[in-house]
Regions:
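Long, charge-dense, solvent-exposed interaction surfaces that engage phosphate-rich ligands
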Residues: 257-259
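ASCE P-loop NTPase motor core, strongest for the SF2 helicase catalytic module
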Residues: 25-252, 261-358
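Accessory nucleic-acid engagement/destabilization modules that flank
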Residues: 1-32
């Protein structure tokens, strides 16, 4: 008898297919998992009614895939191309959970770049107004108050930056979320960085990562993201590096590459725009709102206050007509600060939320 973690079932099944003259007895659970996690034969999960006419066929497949993995408490990486609607696929899963969980409902946590936090709020309010959502913001005491009352909400959204600052509050709270979603999962590419260390300390029943870039581009990044969605699945980084990364990157070992692909394939779903081109609608324009970072806001407000007074004095002295050039110059400066303060201030090295969103 061989006992393996349940999440290695499909990998084992692929290996067994290559073994000849070997008799294997497979129990009911084994056969069920193999069948259900076949991406061509996903379990039929009921899509929430309001999404039936919104989700495109490939997005419905994404919903089924997320739900099937969650049924076994597996994690996964949704790696569709940018613009293919990863957010709405996740929202449909969150709504499905709320509809089907009658008792002991848990809160879910979405962690994103600060520039996308408001986008999550807007998308949820647009497509799933029944979800009670809260974006964590404010000073340290205000954020702590929200975290200590997370049970009041269906979904909490925070940024990677705030999660790093608040991690001790989460640990003290000791709450197990229903889902934790890591948006723009390339933020976890460095396993030793604070972003990755913080989010990996948060407890959840199921973990999913979203990224629009091919994760196979960097094997170290691949390992770090898997270490978040299913800790231990790709072993320790030391073992992963010696078994796969070194063999593939330095030695071009095709056998190691094939084995790694077999390992990760059930838990990564990636569709490109080219693959689903016939399902895509005509081009639409979406206005994304962006909130300035703390340092950027301080600079903007400081310049605004000083400039308003100067312009008022200028108008009082020379009249509106003669002051128009200075008014235009001031507006240009404010616009530059909104775009990126480095356009206005030399050696400005703080993050810029608008640039991050782009």
């Amino acid at each position: 008898t061989v006992r393996l973690p349940v999440n290695r079932t499909l990998y084992l099944n692929q290996l067994l297919k290559k073994m000849k003259n070997t008799e294997i007895t497979k129990d009911k659970q084994y056969r069920e998992i193999v069948n259900n996690l076949n991406k061509d034969l996903l379990e039929e999960e009921n899509i929430p009614q309001q999404f039936e006419n919104i989700l495109r066929p490939y997005q419905k497949t994404g919903f089924q895939w997320l739900k099937t993995l969650d049924n076994y408490r597996f994690g996964g990486i949704l790696a569709d191309d940018m613009g293919l609607g990863k957010t709405i696929q996740v929202i449909s899963m969150l709504v499905s959970y709320k509809e089907n969980q009658e008792e002991n409902k848990k809160t879910s946590l979405v962690v994103s770049p600060s520039s996308l936090a408001l986008n999550w709020k807007n998308e949820i309010e647009k497509f799933a107004p029944e979800l009670n959502i809260k974006v964590i913001s404010g000073n340290a005491n205000q954020r702590k108050e929200i975290i200590n009352e997370i049970e009041r909400y269906d979904v909490i959204v925070t940024s990677y930056d705030l999660l790093k600052r608040d991690i001790e509050i989460y640990k003290e709270k000791n709450y197990t979320f229903r889902f934790i979603i890591a948006d723009e999962a390339q933020y976890l590419k460095n396993n030793n960085a604070k972003n990755a260390k913080a989010i990996k300390q948060i407890k959840a029943d199921s973990r999913f990562a979203l990224t629009g870039t091919p994760i196979e581009n960097s094997l170290a990044e691949l390992w770090s993201i898997f270490d978040f969605v299913m800790p231990g699945y790709l072993f320790s980084y030391k073992k992963f590096k010696s078994t796969y990364e070194t063999a593939i990157v330095k030695d071009n070992d095709e056998d190691a590459m094939k084995k790694l692909k077999m390992l990760i394939e059930p838990f990564v779903l990636r569709r490109t725009k080219k693959e689903v081109l016939t399902e895509l609608p005509e081009k639409t324009i979406t206005v994304l709102k962006n909130e300035m970072g703390e340092e950027q806001r301080k600079i903007y407000l400081s310049y605004l206050v000083r400039t308003k007074q100067k312009l008022q004095d200028e108008i009082n002295s020379n009249g509106y007509e003669r002051s128009q050039i200075k008014i235009l110059a001031a507006l240009t400066r404010l616009r530059q600060i909104c775009c990126h303060p480095s356009l206005f201030i030399d050696n400005y090295n703080e993050p810029c939320s608008k640039l991050e969103q782009c």
